[in-house]
Amino acid sequence: MGTHKQLEVWKNAMELAKIIYKKTAEFPKEELFCLTSQIRRAVVSIPANISEGSGRLQPKEFIYFLRISFGSLTELETLLIIALELDYLDKKDYEKIQNQIKLITVQLSRLISVIRNKVELSSHH
């Protein structure tokens, strides 16, 4: 499959992590070990699991790690809604981040489908 660094979904997840780190640096300091920390852990998990999965030998293992990335992405969405409702994020920044999340969601879904189809094809031969 190649290295994870060649995957557009990984590149976009890395970009999302940078955006999130910059935005959460503006959150109130009392949130550093609470919401800020949870958001950062969730966003870092996305590209980290993509890279870990791509390093596995079995395609089914790769799919497993992509699904973990997907779960972290949905967790991130909820945490960002909380940040928005607490006025830690403004609507414009939230929408920009949401667009990146939507892109990564589509890319993860497609990659999982492509790998699943390859697994099914190889099992029929």
Per-region residue spans from a language model:
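Short, C-terminally biased terminal segments at protein or domain edges
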Residues: M1-H125
